[in-house]
Amino acid sequence: MARIAGIDLPKEKRVEIGLTYIYGIGLPTSQKILKETGVNSDTRVKDLTEEEVNLLRNYIKNLKIEGDLRREVALNIKRLIEIGSYRGIRHRKGLPVRGQKTKTNARTRKGPKKLVGAKKKSK
C-alpha cells in the first residue's frame, strides 16, 4: 500500500483515482501529476515501484494539500467573518454564501427544519 502525504492510497484502484483520496488533489490535478512525473495512469497503486512512489511524493510535496490547504481555507473564512463582509456574515449565520435563494431549499446549509409547535384546538 502506497502512503503519500500521510494518506494510504487504496491498493486496487488506478493511480489516477487513488491520488484523488488526498485532500486538495482532484482528477485534473492527479492527471497533471502523473503526466509530469511520467507515471502511467493505468497502473494500479499496488503495482507502483518504489521509485515511482518516490517521484509522486517529491512532486506532491510542493503542492498545498491536506492540513495546509484546510488551514488556509479556514483562515480565509475567518478573515471574511472578521472584516464583516457580506460573505462573512453569511458564513456566520450559516446561510448559503454564493447567492442561492433561501425561501425554499438551502437545507444543507441551514440544517434540519425547525418546526413551530401548533396549538391544539379546544372543543
Curated annotation (Swiss-Prot):
PROSITE patterns according to UniProt: RIBOSOMAL_S13_1, RIBOSOMAL_S13_2
InterPro entries with a match to the protein in the record: Rbsml_uS13_C, Ribosomal_uS13, Ribosomal_uS13-like_H2TH, Ribosomal_uS13_bac-type, Ribosomal_uS13_CS
A molecular-function term among this protein's GO annotations: structural constituent of ribosome
Keyword Endoplasmic reticulum: no
Keyword Heme: no
UniProt GO cellular component terms: cytosol; small ribosomal subunit
Keywords from the named record: Ribonucleoprotein, Ribosomal protein, RNA-binding, rRNA-binding, tRNA-binding
Pfam families (alphabetical): Ribosomal_S13 (PF00416)
Region (Disordered): 92-123
One GO process term, biological-process aspect: translation
Family (UniProt): Belongs to the universal ribosomal protein uS13 family.
HAMAP family in the cross-refs: Ribosomal_uS13
Task performed by this protein: Located at the top of the head of the 30S subunit, it contacts several helices of the 16S rRNA. In the 70S ribosome it contacts the 23S rRNA (bridge B1a) and protein L5 of the 50S subunit (bridge B1b), connecting the 2 subunits; these bridges are implicated in subunit movement. Contacts the tRNAs in the A and P-sites.
Subunit-level organization: Part of the 30S ribosomal subunit. Forms a loose heterodimer with protein S19. Forms two bridges to the 50S subunit in the 70S ribosome.
Official protein name in the record: Small ribosomal subunit protein uS13
